[in-house]
Swiss-Prot record:
Pfam families (alphabetical): Nexin_C (PF08628), PX (PF00787), PXA (PF02194), RGS (PF00615)
Subcellular location: Cytoplasm; Cell projection, Dendrite
Family from the record: Belongs to the sorting nexin family.
Residue ranges of domain PXA in the record: 78-252
Disulphides: none
Protein name as catalogued: Sorting nexin-14
Major place of residence: cytoplasm
Cited function: Plays a role in maintaining normal neuronal excitability and synaptic transmission. May be involved in several stages of intracellular trafficking.
Gene field: SNX14
Span of domain RGS: 284-416
SMART domains found in the cross-reference section: PX, PXA, RGS
Keyword annotations of the record: Cell projection, Cytoplasm, Phosphoprotein, Protein transport, Transport
Length: 894
């Protein structure tokens, strides 16, 4: 009975547990927790839209994350590491930019922009490294690639007995699967160029890739002068030995001899501008507030970025604070303030709001508590810090993020290029516009400046709809000149001769003006080229009577204005763009094709007269400078004339067709025959575009490209045979995890006996998860030691010397041999004694020797480095996996 019970237990255990069944981690005291770094965001990140979270959001710009604009904000490192990195980047500029730039100019503006770009690139890398789980990447992906590399070395060693030929045999074993960068040094440089270009959208500031000259310069500096020497440094056997000693050394880590340095903003000192001259590309928010045209441009820029509500929140809180700080608030005022606070909470704090802004949780909780409590509690906000800190947070975003972005935006460049010649340069926004100072200088605040009014003011500025029966014309504007509507919105104040006699500071009230269109007249077109044949075009005669200045002693004024048919539609489109549509004041459908002669205009006279009269009765247009210009003689001529499309004259087009269809009489036969003969000849090869290659400031290109250590890499031609070798690339890799990797190395490299291999397979169920958890924990501890301040400074110094110290003497051969010997001894001592008893001393020596010899081959190290680099790049930039076309473009030339 006991025997059968034992058999039944064995059968049950065997059937219930298979090779895929694994016992959980049995070391409860060792728990590896992946490092999670909470990075501040401008707006909450949703599934698609970073602002509102909607999948199909058409309002906001996607991915409004902090790292997209100024990734160095809230990023701090120790001052010593920061100084070391700054020194390396300074050497990059000193060696690869200043030697030729100083011959051009001594202005530091361009170099200052380059400093910001390099800081942006380094900050993006730091943030993305923080986001990935380094131990998991090492154990799950990098070690797997290393296993494949080890198998190639083992198969190559079976073919050659002499270590001198191991590298060439391994390269032949790789066959066509050799990394494309290893074919030759020029292919390696070309690969780094393509890789750098592929990463530009993610490592450079937004829209920086639009500047072709800047991207070419940065590409050559990074690929030829930074990445190539860095990869040479990492693949150098002497460097590999140094890193191995650091990793497998069980002695206590070297303690820092000096106390830890304080944390400083990442590369802030490096990015400080060196240019002593004031730059027009640097504005303060205060300057924008003081100039109405700049404020309008800034608001339009925020609209494009999907961040108008950031400015709207700032203005709303300013108004709210001014009202709540009044002494002795009445119940009605407290009730009004409480209702406004509820709107603030619902608009900017709720997750479902499209205008939600990310605040600290305690800020949202405090605002929610007051908003949902009795209205009397609103006075507590006078002493609470929640609303003040929310305002400071949003103001910081405007000053530190969006203002610098605005200074590099197309909107601001339009202001710089056209502001001097445009009448909008010194103009003021009309009554429907918004000014930050309006909220601070206005004495009568009260209910009229509530959040609803503020929201409608901002949103009304950017409302863009098409009038019923009207078409918003293009007016023949060339590409890149699409902002003429903006210039019509921010209109002239003092160009009209009628306005010149106005009393200073006298408000204009267009509602008191009286207009009529009594008749249609003819007007000679001044744009006609020939004076004797000036075209007479029909125009509307508008009689204007101004009666709004009687209070200051002015008599009613009368004048007449002549406007063309299309000028009315220019006025309509500009008013629509700025103020939205007016349902009770609309022009009839515009005639696109057909004559616009005297009879046609006469039939439209009453409709156009009614349209203007209704516009004058709208309160929001009572002080409109645009409408006043339209009704003033010589007012805004360029606004309403320059952008008009010429009339489409079908008669002229039809009359010109027969002339074009006349039968040719052979006068063009000879050019046709010559072109035909040329088309039959094979085209001559076009000269290749010269490539700018910046490799070294002190050595010739070939000296840097072909060095003594790596020679010409594998020295393969591009058309090498494509025959597939019978190696691991044709086999399915089933190993997964550190336990499987150890079994694989034990079987392939250390040649463990069968009984030990079977025992390890049996204990895999019990210890696989435990070993892998311990490995992640161990790697994390080692990485923390490696990332200590003094060690990081040491590694950065070594990298600096490898790239820039060309004139210094390299490590002597004796020092390198001493380092290699120490590495071999450390590897021998790293193997546990229990394993040595199972496999024997001789097998241990041969196996370690095989691994050690494989690591002493520079080209093989470079192969492994590039394979690992590709994996790391895909982990740091997972967006590359989703863009198949870009990936194909990089590998198509392989």
């Amino acid at each position: 009975m006991i025997f059968w019970s034992f058999v039944a237990g064995v059968v049950t255990f065997y059937c219930s547990l298979g090779p895929d069944s694994l016992l959980p981690n049995i070391f409860f005291t060792i728990k590896y927790k992946p490092k999670q770094l909470g990075l501040q965001e401008l707006f909450p990140q949703g599934h698609s839209c970073a602002v509102c979270g909607k999948v199909k959001c058409k309002r906001h710009r996607p991915s409004l994350l902090l790292e997209n604009y100024q990734p160095w904000l809230d990023l701090k490192i120790s001052s010593k590491v920061d100084a070391s990195l700054s020194e390396v980047l300074e050497l990059v500029l000193e060696n690869f930019v200043y030697p030729w730039y100083r011959d051009v100019t001594d202005d530091e503006s361009f170099v200052d922009e380059l400093r910001i770009t390099l800081r942006f690139f380094a900050s993006v890398l730091i943030r993305r490294i923080h986001k990935v789980d380094i131990p998991s990447i090492i154990t799950k992906k990098l070690l797997k690639a290393a296993m494949k590399h080890i198998e190639v070395i083992v198969k190559a060693r079976q073919k050659v007995k002499n270590t001198e030929f191991l590298q060439q045999a391994a390269l032949e074993e790789y066959g066509p699967e050799l990394h494309v960068a290893l074919r030759s040094r020029r292919d390696e440089l070309h690969y780094l160029r393509k890789l750098t270009e592929l990463l530009f959208p993610y490592i450079l500031p937004p829209k920086a890739t639009d500047c072709r000259s800047l991207t070419l310069l940065i590409r050559e500096i990074l690929s030829g002068s930074v990445f190539l020497p860095s990869l040479d440094f990492l693949a150098d056997p002497d460097t590999v030995n140094h890193l191995l000693i650091i990793f497998i050394d069980d002695s206590p880590p070297e303690k820092a001899t000096e106390p830890a340095s304080p944390l400083v903003p990442f590369l802030q000192k490096f990015a400080e501008p060196r240019n002593k001259k004031p730059s027009v590309l640097k504005l303060e928010l205060k300057q924008i507030r003081e100039q109405q045209d700049l404020l309008f441009r800034f608001m339009n820029f925020l609209k494009q970025e999907g961040a108008v509500h950031v400015l709207q929140f700032c203005l709303t809180v300013e108004e709210f604070n001014d009202r709540i700080l009044r002494p002795e608030l009445s119940n009605d005022e407290m009730l009004s303030l409480h209702e406004e606070l509820q709107k603030i909470y619902k608009t900017y704090c709720l997750d479902e709001s499209i205008d939600k802004i990310r605040f600290d949780p305690f800020i949202v909780e405090e605002i929610q508590r007051i908003a949902e409590g009795p209205y009397i509690d609103v006075v507590k906000l006078q002493t609470m810090r929640c609303l003040f800190e929310a305002y400071e947070h949003v103001l910081s975003l405007l000053e530190n993020v969006f203002t610098p972005m605005f200074c590099h935006s197309d909107e601001y460049f339009r202001q710089l290029l056209r502001g001097a010649e445009s009448p909008t340069r010194n103009s003021k926004l009309n009554r429907g516009s918004l000014s930050l100072d309006d909220f601070r200088n206005t004495q009568k605040r009260g209910e009229s400046f509530g959040i609803s009014r503020i929201g409608s003011k901002i949103k009304g500025v950017f409302k863009s709809t098409t009038m019923e029966g009207a078409m918003l014309p293009n007016y023949g504007v060339a590409e890149g000149e699409d902002d003429f509507i903006e210039e019509g919105i921010v209109v002239m104040e003092d160009d009209s001769p009628v306005e010149a006699v106005s009393t200073p500071n006298t408000p204009r009230n267009l509602a008191a003006w009286k207009i009529s269109i009594p008749y249609v007249d003819f007007f000679e077109d001044p744009s006609s080229e020939r004076k004797e044949k000036k075209e007479r075009i029909p125009v509307f005669c508008i009689d204007v009577e101004r009666n709004d200045r009687r209070a200051v002693g002015h008599e009613p004024e009368h004048w007449s204005v002549y406007r063309r048919y299309l000028e009315f539609y220019v006025l309509e489109s500009k008013l629509t763009e700025f103020h939205g549509t007016f349902p009770d004041a609309q022009l009839p459908s515009k005639r696109i094709i057909g004559p616009k002669n005297y009879e046609f205009l006469k039939s439209k006279r009453e409709e156009f007269q009614e349209y203007l009269q209704k516009l004058l009765q709208h309160p929001e247009l009572s002080n409109s400078q645009l409408l006043a210009d339209f009704l003033s003689p010589n007012g805004g001529e360029t606004q309403f004339l320059d952008k008009i499309l010429p009339d489409v004259n079908l008669g002229k087009i039809i009359k010109s067709v027969p002339g074009k269809l006349m039968k040719e009489k052979g006068q063009h036969l000879e050019p046709f025959i010559m072109n035909f003969i040329n088309s039959c000849e094979s085209p001559k090869p076009k000269p290749s575009r010269p490539e700018l290659t910046i490799l070294s400031p002190t050595s010739e290109n070939n000296k840097k490209l072909f060095n003594d250590l790596f020679k010409n890499n594998a020295n393969r031609a591009e058309n090498t045979e494509r025959k597939q070798n019978q190696n691991y690339f044709m086999e399915v890799m089933t190993v997964e995890g550190v336990y499987d990797y150890l079994m694989y190395v034990g079987r392939v490299v250390f040649q463990v006996p069968d009984w030990l291999h079977h025992l390890l397979m049996g204990t895999r169920i019990l210890f696989k998860n435990t070993l892998e958890m311990y490995t992640d924990y161990y790697l994390q501890c080692k990485l923390e030691q490696l990332f200590q301040e003094h060690r990081l400074v040491s590694l950065i110094t070594l990298l600096r010397d490898a790239i820039f110290c060309e004139n210094t003497e390299p490590r002597s051969l004796q020092d390198k041999q001493k380092g290699a010997k120490q590495t071999f001894e450390e590897m021998m001592n790293y193997i546990p004694d229990l394993l040595v008893k199972c496999i024997g001393e001789e097998t241990k020596y041969e196996s370690i020797r095989l691994l050690f010899d494989g690591l002493q081959q520079p080209v093989l190290n470079k192969q492994l480095t590039y394979v690992l680099l590709d994996i790391v790049i895909q982990e740091l930039f997972p967006e590359l996996n989703k863009v198949q076309k870009e990936v194909t473009s990089v590998t198509s030339w392989m």
